[in-house]
A protein has these predicted regions:
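Rossmann-like NAD(P)(H) cofactor-binding subdomain of soluble oxidoreductases
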Residues: 83-135
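Residues at the starts of beta-strands that form the adenosine-phosphate
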Residues: 5, 34-36, 119, 146, ...
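NAD(P)+-binding Rossmann beta1-loop-alpha1 motif at the extreme N-terminus of oxidoreductases
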Residues: 1-65, 70
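Short glycine-/small-residue-rich Rossmann-like dinucleotide-binding loops
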Residues: 75-77, 101-102, 125, 200
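Internal alpha-helical scaffold of NAD(P)-dependent oxidoreductase catalytic cores
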Residues: 139-225
Length: 292
C-alpha cells in the first residue's frame, strides 16, 4: 500500500527517526516508487539539517501539508491536538493523518471530529531515548519494537492498511489497541517509570553531597536514565494522561508502603517472599519480551 507524498510535522527524535527510516526504506525498495518527503519544523537549525533527507523543508504548516497524501504529526501531544484542529482549514479537501503521540485519548478524540474528507489513525511507537532532537534520531529506532495503532471514527480499511505497511517499513511490529486501553497500559510501563526515575533523580540531587555521584553505579544509572527525557514532551504526556498516571502513582506508592512496613516490622519471611515474587515477575517479563 504505497503513499507517495508524506509530510512529517516535527523533526525531533521520533519524527526524525521516522523520516530517516522511511527515506532508507524507500531507497532500498524494489521496485523503486515515487516518494516525496516534506518536513515542517519551527527550529531553523533542524530545518537546515533536514535538507539532506527531505525534498521540501518549511516552517509553514499550511505550505507543508497542502500537497501531502499523508501527514504524520510528531510534535508534543497538545501541539498535535492543536494541529488537528487547524487541518480542516489548511486542507479542506482532506488527507490521511497519522501521529506519534505518547498519549492517545485526546488525540484520537480530535481525530474523531475531523471532517469526512479526512482519514485518521493514532500511532505510538514503544521506543525512545533519554535524549531529544533530530541529532539523536536514527533510522533503526523502531526496528523490532512494538508500534501501537489506535483506530478512530475516521479510520478506514484503506488507512489502516497504509498505517500497517508504514509500521512494517519502519521495521516495527504493529499492535492495534483502543485509545483508552493504550493510555492505561502506557501509564504503567512508560509514564510511571519516568515519574519514578524523576523522583529518584530529584531525591539524589537534593542529598547535597558531591561524593554521591562517584559512589553511584549501574543500578542508579539504569534506574534514573529516563529522567533525562525532554521535559516539554513529558509535560504534555502527564497532563493529557492525568487520570491513568495518577492511578499508577497511587498503586506504586502502595507498593512502597507495603515493603516499607515489612522492613519496619522486620518480617523476614514476608519480605523474602515479596522480593522473590518481584524477581519472578521480572524474569517472566523478560521471557515475554524475548518470546515477542
Amino acid at each position: 500500500m504505497h503513499v507517495e507524498r508524506i509530510c512529517v510535522v516535527g523533526l525531533g527524535l521520533m519524527g526524525g527517526s521516522l523520516a530517516l527510516a522511511l527515506r532508507l526504506a524507500r531507497r532500498l525498495a524494489i521496485p523503486q516508487r515515487p516518494f516525496h518527503l516534506t518536513i515542517v519544523d519551527t527550529n531553523p537549525k533542524t530545518r537546515a539539517a533536514a535538507g539532506r533527507i527531505a525534498d521540501f523543508v518549511s516552517d509553514d504548516l499550511a505550505l507543508g501539508v497542502q500537497n501531502a497524501d499523508l501527514v504524520v504529526l510528531a510534535t508534543p501531544v497538545r501541539t498535535i491536538v492543536n494541529v488537528l484542529h487547524q487541518l480542516p482549514i489548511l486542507r479542506p479537501d482532506g488527507c490521511l493523518v497519522f501521529d506519534l503521540g505518547s498519549s492517545k485519548s485526546d488525540i484520537c478524540r480530535a481525530m474523531d471530529h475531523l471532517p469526512d474528507s479526512f482519514q485518521a489513525i493514532g500511532g505510538h511507537p514503544m521506543c525512545g531515548k533519554e535524549v531529544a532532537g533530530f541529532g539523536a534520531a536514527t533510522p533503526d529506532l523502531f526496528r523490532q519494537q512494538t508500534f501501537i495503532l489506535c483506530p478512530t471514527q475516521r479510520t478506514t480499511p484503506h488507512l489502516e492498511a497504509v498505517a500497517h505497511q508504514l509500521v512494517v517499513d519502519l521495521g516495527a511490529r504493529p499492535l492495534v489497541l483502543p485509545p483508552a486501553l493504550h493510555d492505561n497500559m502506557v501509564a504503567v510501563v512508560s509514564h510511571l517509570p519516568y515519574m519514578v526515575a524523576a523522583a529518584l533523580m530529584r531525591h539524589a540531587a537534593q542529598v547535597g553531597d558531591e561524593r554521591l555521584w562517584p559512589v553511584s553505579s549501574s543500578g542508579f544509572r539504569d534506574t534514573s536514565r529516563v529522567a533525562g527525557t525532554d521535559p516539554q514532551m513529558m509535560l504534555d504526556i502527564l497532563l493529557t494522561n492525568k487520570t491513568a498516571v495518577l492511578q499508577q502513582i497511587a498503586h506504586y506508592q502502595n507498593q512502597l508502603a507495603d515493603v516499607a512496613a515489612l522492613i519496619e516490622t522486620h518480617d523476614e519471611d514476608a519480605l523474602l517472599q515479596w522480593l522473590t515474587e518481584t524477581q519472578q515477575a521480572y524474569w517472566a517479563y523478560r521471557q515475554a519480551k524475548k518470546d515477542g
